[in-house]
Amino acid sequence: MKRLTCFCALAAVAASANLAAVTCYTVPEEYRSGLWEATVDGQANGVASARTCDPPFDKRYDFGGEYAFTAFEMDAPAKVMVRPKAARDMSKVRILPASAPVMLRTLPDGALELSVARPCRFSVEPDGRRHPLLVFANPPERNVPDERDPKVKAFGPGVHLGGEKGRIELKDGETLYLTAGAFVKGGIRAHG
């Protein structure tokens, strides 16, 4: 009986360790990318869309227009699959920085299999700076502030307007905490 109990306990620890290896984030519908989709260890992971300043706003430079980003937490090596939503030439994909702990494999259907060895940040660039995918493979969060603390201004998953008139005011000793999946519209003004 001791042997069976010990085996069951070890199996439970191994299973929970396996489940905790990756935490995927969601992205609200209005921010989802039209360029890319991603999975991490088989789980759907949100991909958000963003823009750089591009013509006609700044006619002197072309900064590349729309890009996308995806983020997740990992505490063990992870397999990330990314796929462009529209047909794209994926034959010259670069991972930058080149020193990122990522192994790239291009699949016949145009999907990319990225073996990420440890938490890091990198970009997937099929054709230079045009419509890249930024990947934020974060370590698990530590020292999370208590959202019930009156000195903590916390925003949970979803879309939020930051404070009055879109401005978040922070005073001396206050902490701003954005949980995974929080999208806050507005600016931050810190005093103290």
Per-range role (PLM):
Residues L4-T5, H191:
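Small/flexible residues
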Residues T5-L19:
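Hydrophobic h-region of N-terminal signal peptides that target proteins for export
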Residues L19-G192:
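Extracellular/periplasmic carbohydrate-active domains that bind, remodel
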